[in-house]
Amino acid sequence: DLMLLCLEMLREDSACLKRWQAQFRYILVDEFQDISPVQYEIVRLLAAPENNLFIVGDDDQSIYGFRGASPESMMRFLTDYRAAEQILLDVNYRCHEDIVNAAGRVIAENRNRLEKNILAAHREGEGIALYTCANEEELRKNLLESLLQEQRNGRLTRCAMICRTNFACGLWAQVLHGAGIPYVMREK
C-alpha cells in the first residue's frame, strides 16, 4: 500500500522527512474526518516541527469508514494540537429548521463525537415526513405514492432523490419511468 510505504519512509529516513517538511510551510487538510490513521500520521510528520496545520472537517459527516477513515482523527487532533484554535461553523444554510433539528436528534445518538449544536438559518419549512418501511417493495410503493401526489399538486419540481449507488439510481429511474414521473439524473 502506497500510504504505508510513504509512512514507513518518513519514519525511517530522517533526511527524507526533513526534505519534505521543508517543502511545506503550511498544510491544509479538507474533509479531515475522512482520513485514515495512516494519513493522519503522515500529515502529522509533514507538519512538524512548525505545526502550521489547518484542518476542516465534521466528525458527524464521516462516511468512509469502509476505507479506513476514522472520525476519531478529529478528537486526536484536538489532543495532539492543544494550541490550535477551533472555529465551529454551527449554522446550516442549506436546510430548514425541521430538517436540521431532526438530523441533530439522530446524530446525537453517535457515541464518539465532538459535542455541537447546529442551528438552521432558515426557520420556516413544511416539516418532514418519516416513513418506516418493512422492505424495499414497501419503500418503493410509499415513495412512488408520495411523488405521484406531488405531481398531481403541481409540486414535483420541489422533489429530489439522493441515492447512495449508481445501481439504486438505475432502479429508481425504471420505477419513475414506469409510473410516468419525469426526472433528471445527475452525478454529484
Regions found by a protein language model. Give the residues of each.
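Conserved helicase NTPase motor core
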Residues: 1-76, 91-95
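Helicase P-loop NTPase motor core
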Residues: 82-85, 90-183
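Short, ordered loop/turn segments at secondary-structure junctions
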Residues: 188
